[in-house]
């Protein structure tokens, strides 16, 4: 479900004073000043990883499953410079990777007695890379879906959701039913859980006697931010944690509400023993209290899992 890496491109475009408002949209009266610049360069810096110690049984299980893990595991993800990928992942001014996803994977590596060889790709290449063996593990806010579970295995570690963000002067304040979006133009990521949900519910507006919503799908978020600024897009449908972060750091936008939630997990090759080992590692971190420290650091306490599961039943 990740649309995180593409948000980086939006900042470069949107931060140079986005287009003046020119919309007759019924929900937007003046969206001129939306600017995807961070209002603060601060981020949490406490160390939540060094206290994690290697677990001998998990280390042995890892080497039995993959002897090459003694020299490290390859992890496929997307490049996230700056702070705009937070709370999941980003980079500080020193080029150090930061974020909840980063802390969690580093804690897991310590627990397993291994290291990560992080390789960056694009969101749509990570799962194929896991399938063909390029990556041992993929991590990029992948939501569990039935389609994905057919080709990779999941070890869950977080719950994220599908939420809505709009210009601050939008007449929308909370969306409890998708039919409230009827007649509006929605921006969303192509090939994501957001597209799945919008397509699945597309007929509901007509059934309610309302004008259907229009969706514009993009491979990165720069056009969505531009659309919000010039009134061509009424709402942005994206991941909950990212949009909540954006609402706190982007001028003149507001978080509306969450429509649904989805477990998020590491992905491994179908049938790989690594999924079970990763789930056991997450569960060990939960039992030891280390997992809670990571969530608290990034203020996402309410989005954790009570236990990591391999291939839970998908709702999408």
Regions found by a protein language model. Give the residues of each.
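A ligand-binding cleft/hinge motif common to bilobed small-molecule-binding domains
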Residues: 125, 141-149, 199-200, 227-260
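Extracytoplasmic small-molecule ligand-binding "clamshell" domains
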Residues: 30-139
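Bilobed "Venus flytrap"/periplasmic-binding protein-like clamshell domains
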Residues: 81, 94-110, 142, 160-220, ...
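Bacterial lipoprotein signal-peptidase II cleavage site
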Residues: 22-32
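Acidic, polar ligand-binding/catalytic clefts
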Residues: 115-179
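C-terminal motif of bacterial Sec signal peptides marking the signal peptidase cleavage site
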Residues: 17-21
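Periplasmic-binding protein-like
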Residues: 159-166, 244-283, 301-316
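Extended ligand-binding regions for polar small-molecule ligands
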Residues: 34-56, 102-111, 170, 179, ...
């Amino acid at each position: 479900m990740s649309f995180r890496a593409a948000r980086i491109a939006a900042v470069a475009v949107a931060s140079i004073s986005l287009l003046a408002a020119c919309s007759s949209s019924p929900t937007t009266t003046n969206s001129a000043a939306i600017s995807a610049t961070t209002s603060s360069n601060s981020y949490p810096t406490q160390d939540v990883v060094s206290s994690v110690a290697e677990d001998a049984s998990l280390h042995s299980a890892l080497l039995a499953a993959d002897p090459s893990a003694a020299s490290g595991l390859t992890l496929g993800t997307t490049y996230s410079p700056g702070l705009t990928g937070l709370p999941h992942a980003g980079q500080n001014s020193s080029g150090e990777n930061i974020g909840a996803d980063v802390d969690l994977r580093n804690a897991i590596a310590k627990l397993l007695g291994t290291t990560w060889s992080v390789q960056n790709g694009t969101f749509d290449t990570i799962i194929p890379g896991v399938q063909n063996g390029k990556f041992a593990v993929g991590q990029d806010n992948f939501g569990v879906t039935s389609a994905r579970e057919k080709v990779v295995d999941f070890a869950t570690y977080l719950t994220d959701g599908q939420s809505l963000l709009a210009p601050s002067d939008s007449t929308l304040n909370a969306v409890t039913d998708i039919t409230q979006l009827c007649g509006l133009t929605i921006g969303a990521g192509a090939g994501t859980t957001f597209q799945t949900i919008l397509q699945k519910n597309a007929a509901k507006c007509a059934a309610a006697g309302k004008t259907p919503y229009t969706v514009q799908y993009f491979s990165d978020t720069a056009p969505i931010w531009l659309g919000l600024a010039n009134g061509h897009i009424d709402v942005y449908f994206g991941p909950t944690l990212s949009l909540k972060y954006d609402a706190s750091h982007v001028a003149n936008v507001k978080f509306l509400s969450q429509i649904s939630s989805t477990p998020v997990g590491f992905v491994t090759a179908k049938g790989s023993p690594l999924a079970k080992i990763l789930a056991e590692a997450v569960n060990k971190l939960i039992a030891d209290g280390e997992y809670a420290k990571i969530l608290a650091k990034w203020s996402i306490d309410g989005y954790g899992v009570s236990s990591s599961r391999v291939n839970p039943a998908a709702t999408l």
